[in-house]
Structures are given as C-alpha cells and as structure tokens.
Amino acid sequence: SSFALGALLASVCLPAEAQVDLVKDGKTKSIIILQQDSRVNRTAANILRLFVERISGADMPVVTNKTARKGDVIIGSEAPMDVKEDGYALSTAGGILKISGKANGVVYGAVSLLEDYLGVDYWGENEYSLTKSENISLPLIEKVDNPAFRYRQTQCYAMKNDSIYKWWNRLEEPEEAFAAGYWVHTFDKLLPAEV
C-alpha cells in the first residue's frame, strides 16, 4: 500500500514527455503541411521554418497534400468555434502540432508558438534574439487566443522594410483594413475643396 502510494507520487513528479519533437540532435523528420496553400498559411509556414532553422540548423520542408504523422506540423486546419477574427489555436494533441486560425490568426499562432514555447523575441526591424539548440520539443499545448483589438497599427517604418516585424507585432496598415488611398490627408478625394 505505501509502495503503491510512493510509486504513484514518483510518477507524478517525473518530467512530462514531449508531445512533439520537431528537431532532435540537429536533425528533423518533421514536415510542415499546409492544409490549403493560401498566402497566410504559407507565411506562417515560412516564418516557422525560418526560425526553426535559425534555432537548430534543421530545415523543415513545407508541403501540401500529405497525411500528417507524429512529429509533423499542420498549418491551416479548421479553427475551433471559439476562435474569432485574427485569433488562433495551437494544439499538440496526438503528437502533431496544429496551428489554425481565422484571417491572419494562423500567422499570429506561428509567431506565438515561436515566442512562447521556443523563446524567440523580435525586438525591431531585423532585430531578434533566440537561444540556439539542437533539440526542439514542445509540451502539451491546447491554446486559443483572440486579439483584444480589431485593428492594430504603429507608425514604425520597420513595417515597410521587414515583413516579419509586421507579422510578429500583429500590425496592420490602413490600406489593409480601410479603403486604399483614402486615409488622413486624402479627404479631398471624398469631399473636394471646391464644394
């Protein structure tokens, strides 16, 4: 009886096994599978691939029309019901990393994964920090996140020169959310001075 209790307590104290091993000893068998080959899915895949390579030196191929196996990444699968516009979901259930979202949320999910679980910080235009490692393992993740604001903007010039900065900080430009060419100093187009 006391042996069983001791064994139970010991098993609870053991470290949890990784849910998904993306890179082991600098090598990967994982692939990134796009559910649909869209601009946001491909952007999410390319950002994830870039930083996995910068961290570990391992290159994860991006493919379409493949069946996922344990250790793979699926980008763009159907988002859970509680994901709103630009929100995302991360899951490592079944040993497969799934990044899903609505609108730009898929990219924001990839960025959050890099930031929250792989320790990548993006500070400014082409300025980031990370810890190199030959191993990248993810714990059990079941996360849904929705942005507090519909529109996020800054006047930082880095947005024009560094697309990763823009995605990382979840920023938008006026022409992406409003009528292109009709912003601030263009009111003359809407209401000409002659009127």
Question: Language-model segments: what does each one mean?
Answer:
Residues 44-47, 51-53, 85-195:
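Feature activates predominantly on carbohydrate-active enzymes
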